Amino acid sequence: MRNKTWVFVAGMMVIYAVFSLLGGGVELRVVRLFEKHEAELAEQMAAFEETGELMGAENWMDVTHWDGEHDMVEYTVTAAGDTYYGFYYSPDDVPLACQNTEVPLTEAEKGWAWRAEGDNHGYTYQLKENWFYFEASF
């Protein structure tokens, strides 16, 4: 019985590893979504900068404009538990914390990390000029 349980657990771990590699995880899916819609997103941001109105992406994800020293337009793509994933447009091409929260950013492995009150924290890195990936946990 123990041997069958061990084989089952090992098999499930292999299946999980294969699906993780093939699917690439949440981060890769968010980046692929950005890349797939990059031209459309660029058009939306050009229109937003001209009119001040967000149009288009609301049908397929949560889009919010956050004012601040450096404005941002945040596209929240998905969430898992208390962690949110997405990307944002920074007209000034500067990295920002989730929801444009005024907290300091510190350099991290390939981007910047931030920490706010309690266990609120996140991570961001640049995808291309004016565009950044983010993860935020609350």
Please name every model-derived segment:
Residues 1-15:
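N-terminal Sec-pathway targeting helices
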Residues 16-81:
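N-terminal export/targeting and maturation segments
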Residues 8, 19, 34, 48, ...:
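Phenylalanine-focused residue identity feature
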Residues 52-138:
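Extracytosolic and intramembrane catalytic regions of membrane-associated proteins
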